[in-house]
A protein has these predicted regions:
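Thiamine diphosphate
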Residues: 248, 252-275, 279-281, 501-509
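Flexible, low-hydrophobicity surface segments
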Residues: 1-161, 184-187, 273, 600
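Short, well-structured alpha-helical segments that form the helix of a local strand-helix-strand
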Residues: 392-400
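Short, well-ordered beta-strand elements within core beta-sheets of diverse protein domains
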Residues: 35-48, 112-118, 367, 378, ...
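Gly/Pro-rich active-site capping loops and adjacent beta-alpha segments
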Residues: 2, 73, 96, 107, ...
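Glycine- and acidic-rich phosphate- and metal-coordinating loops
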Residues: 241-249, 280-282, 522-523
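Helix-loop-helix junctions that connect adjacent transmembrane helices in secondary transporters/permeases
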Residues: 84, 149-235, 403-487, 507
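Glycine-centered tight turns that cap/initiate beta-strands
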Residues: 61-64, 241, 308, 519
């Protein structure tokens, strides 16, 4: 029986993507469809004194002009996506979530103030220019380090300060460790704000059908089922009346996991009011001011060590920029806390985090979701410690890695899921040594770097391990069905934004049912096709949805073998699944196709036997109790031009401890994409 897991199989979805046959949100066109455009704030912080929409309403082709006041009682802030952790006592938390349209005050550049609905996007954009808004400019809170000054202006007037959250976590006895430390390294470390800037901007098409009383929404979301649930609640509908479809999406990276953007509420709402379909496609300028961002933190960090480089403790007091609102609560800073000790055995840890409101676009997870900041802090401190102690940077890391016999390793703090942070398994040293070997670390230090520096060239090398908590819950589900055609249909709630799900999920099913991987059809991200799930984020597609698909396919396999055993009059253990057939192992010609079995499983006559059910179909769910812990190493040789400060990457090596690899080709693409985004974050982005 041919096995597909582990094979470098070209992606099933690529022909559609390459030939333009894949459906994206902007491809959705419905007769009579209207178009939306938004007047957004050019001010970071200002009172709204007046809004004159008269000229916009009078423009030919304009159907509606909506302000916050025009929404009446239906205007309300969005619900928080994450609540404060119930297990932490030493915490202050203030939740302020985004609003559909600004009312009385704008809190960041790009905040929507007025929505215009027109017969075309051109008319809608022109009408936006007709609107007159009188602002009273206020001093903005632009810097997280001054946000908590007593004289600082308030982002939210109903609060006493710009404090969104304060929380302390600790492990061991940090002060005792500090008293015993032989070396103390202290630094202030800053991380800049950046944007994901996915290739495809956000977009929504909402279609309320008054006759069927049914809402259909096409949305560039990473979480179609939670979006459905939220829309049903906000619009006063049953969940069965709302269908959310996340078609092909040109990159997600976290911002498209946001629930809910103002536009995601406003377009379905206005579609219901007008009884017509409405489309909005974000332009690139809007993307930079109206789509969530991440990364900005300032850490006052400290590392305690012995003279031989053994880490005794790590502490950091840090500020996290939440922007104007905090819909995701503590997700980002808790991820930072959880990763600020890296892959190392750190017996004493103290973390004091403060989240502040600023007059900037609010922050939500972007690829890494707070984890890269924590890793950067501990690795920066280790590099400084290695230099001051005269220890090789790789050697000081090897001395402090969590040893293999320490797993499962309890960090002694909670993570973003509000559960005990436990690293499930690992053996880190071989990956570090492999990366050093691949990049030629010893040869570079011994021969290449001295030679190049003698020529006046500025070259350096670094090797950094990382851990990442991934594959988090709560759960995902899947349904696997054998069709009478012999093809397999798989439905799951997770959407896809380029991860290769149409192929990797098909490989899982093909291995179980003995079919060609191209005979497995995936339907994903459609709440009408599969009703329960969470979304695609935190590297959880393969781990969580993949396990649900595997469980469903396993049940279907059992049904197939049971029915085939009856029809072929052969014990199940003597049957094989291959090439879409069930065969008797020693008599290949004695067989039956999966399609024929599917037809037999759905009889047109006779009663269904007790304890059985028609069809070759199964639905299963998978919910991990805790996330999986990924580990890897990045190594780079770089040259810097001292006159222009331009950089050139000479060599770059990545070693990943991946566990079971579903498809090496897809895996390579994921790693390459992560490296490219990381290089962009480090060298080319600052907002």
């Amino acid at each position: 029986m041919k096995k597909y897991i582990g094979e470098r199989i070209k992606r099933n979805e690529d022909p559609r993507l390459l030939t333009g046959e894949a459906l994206f949100v902007d491809d959705v066109n419905i007769p009579g469809m209207l178009h939306a455009a938004f007047l957004r704030s050019d001010y970071a912080h200002a009172n709204l004194l007046s809004i004159d929409i008269t000229q916009a309403q009078e423009r030919p082709g304009v159907v509606a002009v909506i302000t916050a006041e025009g929404m009446g009682d239906e205007w309300q802030p969005g619900p928080p996506n994450v609540s404060p952790p119930p297990t932490v006592e030493d915490i202050t938390f203030h939740s302020r979530t985004q609003v559909p349209l600004a009312k009385g005050k704008v809190r960041h550049v790009g905040e929507p103030i007025v929505m215009v609905i027109a017969e075309s996007r051109y008319i809608a954009e022109d009408a936006v220019e007709d609107i007159l808004v009188e602002f009273e400019a206020l001093e903005p809170v632009a810097d997280i380090e001054s946000a908590l000054d007593p004289q600082a202006p308030l982002v939210h007037d109903d609060l006493d300060s710009n404090l969104a959250c304060h929380m302390i976590q600790n492990k061991g006895d940090y002060q005792a460790a500090k008293a015993a430390a032989e070396v103390i390294i202290s630094r202030v470390i800053e991380i800049d704000r950046g944007a994901a800037a996915a290739m495809e901007n956000r977009g929504i098409v909402a279609h309320w059908d008054p006759k069927s009383q049914h809402m259909t929404v096409w949305d560039t979301t990473q979480a179609p089922i939670p979006i459905r649930n939220g829309l049903a609640s906000r619009l006063g509908l049953n969940q069965s009346q709302v269908r959310v479809i996340a078609p092909f999406i040109g990159g997600g990276f976290g911002p498209k996991m946001m629930m809910h953007y103002p536009e995601e509420i406003l377009l379905p709402w206005i579609s219901m009011k007008l009884g017509k379909p409405v489309k909005w496609i974000e332009d690139r300028r809007e993307n930079f001011v109206g789509t969530t961002q991440e990364r900005r933190q300032v850490h006052d960090a400290e590392m305690l060590l012995t003279k031989d480089g053994k880490i005794l403790g790590v502490s950091h007091t840090f500020l996290h920029d939440s922007g104007a609102y905090d819909p995701y609560g503590l997700t980002l800073p808790l991820n930072t806390e959880s990763h600020a000790t890296g892959a190392y055995d750190v017996p004493n840890y103290y973390s004091d985090l403060t989240v502040v409101f600023t007059n900037k676009m609010y922050t939500t997870p972007i690829r890494g979701a707070g984890r890269p900041q924590g890793i950067f802090v501990v690795e920066r401190l280790l590099d400084i410690a290695a230099k001051e102690l005269g220890i090789d940077p790789i050697e000081i890391r090897l001395r402090n890695l969590i040893p293999p016999d320490a797993f499962p390793y309890d960090r002694g703090i909670i993570d973003q899921a509000f559960s005990r942070l436990i690293f499930d398994s690992g053996n880190y040293q071989p990956a570090v040594e492999k990366a050093a070997e691949m990049i030629g670390y010893e040869e570079f230090i011994r021969d290449e770097q001295p030679r190049l520096r003698a020529e006046g060239r500025h070259v350096g090398i670094a090797l950094v391990p990382f851990v990442e908590t991934t594959g988090v819950g709560p759960y995902e589900g899947a349904r696997v069905t054998v069709e009478p055609s012999g093809k397999i249909n798989v439905a799951t709630g997770v959407g896809t934004q380029g991860q290769g799900h149409f192929t990797s999920f098909a490989q899982i099913v093909a291995d179980q049912l003995g079919v060609d991987v191209r005979d497995v059809n995936l339907v994903s991200g459609d709440s009408a096709e599969f009703h329960w799930g969470t979304g695609t984020f935190a590297s959880r597609g393969a781990v969580v949805a993949g396990n649900a698909i595997h469980a469903s396919a396993t049940i279907v396999r059992e049904k197939v073998l049971k029915l085939a055993s009856k029809l072929l009059e052969t014990p199940e253990e003597e049957l094989e699944l291959e090439d879409g057939f069930v065969r008797v192992a020693d008599i290949p010609r004695q067989s039956i196709s999966l399609g024929d079995l599917a037809a037999e499983a759905n009889p047109l006559r006779g009663a269904v036997e007790p304890g059985t059910e028609p069809g070759l179909e199964a639905t299963a769910y998978f919910g991990p109790k805790s996330g999986a812990t990924a580990f890897g190493v990045h190594a780079m040789i770089i040259e810097v031009d001292p006159e222009t400060l331009m950089i050139e990457i000479k060599r770059y090596v990545v070693v990943e401890d991946c566990g079971t690899v579903l498809n090496p080709l897809i895996l390579d693409g994921q790693v390459h994409g992560g490296v490219a985004m990381g290089i962009g974050n480090a060298y080319y982005e600052q907002l």
